Amino acid sequence: AEAYYRFKNNLAVVNVTSGPGGTNAITGVYGAWVDSIGMVVISGQVKWETTVRSTALPLRQYGDQELDIEELVKPITKYTKMITEPKSIRYHLEKAFYIAKSGRPGPVWIDVPADIQNAEINPKKLLTYKPKKIVKKICTLKLMVRSFYVIIQSNVNLGKICFFFG
């Protein structure tokens, strides 16, 4: 995924299994985090009902090869999410791809429990991610910067402000 991003300047998807598959991917994800490399990691997970999180018990592990990978990778990803509702899968995938590419690129991680992977989903009921508010803010900031530049440039041209470069 890192090499693909470096050569194509586009995201690659890494698909890993639960437990050790996720932990083995952490080194590469950390490298992507440090070097600002965008990538999307999708990991498998045991059924939601056999995760520690679903039980709220003070255990380290509940299901076979279960690991709360979300908590492990939060410090080295721009976005991480365990999918708990089948209808939210599209929303979180779209959000992950958007975040991985926006601003300073970086890795994102989506964890998908087995029961969510096997769920029947009505495509018409899938939630979608719409970052309109973020885009609007960026456009507003861009206009503010342009306006500021025009004011500075005008004052420089009038001799009111002197810049020294060197």
Regions found by a protein language model. Name each.
Residues 1-166:
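N-terminal alpha/beta PP-like core and its mobile active-site loop of ThDP/TPP-dependent enzymes
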